[in-house]
Amino acid sequence: MIQSCIFDLYGTLVDIHTDEGNPEVWKKLALFFSYYGADYEPEELKEAYSLQVRKLTETFRKEQEKKAEKENDGQPDKKNRNPGEGTESPEYESSPEIQMEEVFLQLYRERGVEADRTLAVHTGQFFRSLSTEYLRLYDGVEIMLSSLRKVGKKIYLLSNAQSIFTAHEIKALHLDRWFDRMFLSSDYGCKKPDPRFFETLLNTCEIDRNTAVMIGNDGTCDIQGAKRAGLSAVYLHTNLSPVETVAEADAVIEGADMIQLEKLLLGEL
């Protein structure tokens, strides 16, 4: 029987549309930077932002690889093997997640401005609000979560997301009251499908993987990641799902059908 329900966020419980390519976003963000003495042209800021994301991600990846080798006496990381498997899939071994406030700190520094972390966080939140066209729950989400709670199931969030804005979006949608514990990737330095992210949740919350299920809309991050962690997985094929074939899911639900999902998780299907 399912006792622990582990949910993805965006595309699973939350419908969101962001457009970071909108020129108006960068025009307004450049104006915001200028308030603090960091002058950028909009397109220049956009390019500098993309470059910093790539640079910081690659630097963090290399740091993680060096740390893993050191912990294993110079040998490749062998901690994240699949339960019962003797081989590894390298593409899953390193899925680093940087903290976006570091990107904005660097962008200020490039213009000679020593911004503090608070300003960097607020800049990131402003950027997110500029680029978000809508943010809403899928129909029936709270009814479904309430039904799970009423029968005593544990509810967890495991999301590839940036804490500086996702934590606030969760509060704005009044979702935080439903979760026993929330895990956002930027707080842990790795993201799905990295086995370390799944293991962090399972170990921290002392979850029996035999009675737990992952629910998500991404075949690689959610479904394959869950399977590698020894979890059952339910795939929601929603408007935000990548174009993909999902063969490993234990169950597939077309659309964000919370009625069907509720029945499935309660053992009524």
Residues covered by each model-derived region:
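A metal-dependent, Asp-based hydrolase signature
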Residues: A30, Y40-Q125
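A short, well-structured juxtamembrane/interface segment
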Residues: L137-V141
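Surface-exposed cleft-lining segments at the edges of enzyme active sites
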Residues: P90, F126-L135
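Walker B catalytic carboxylates
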Residues: D8
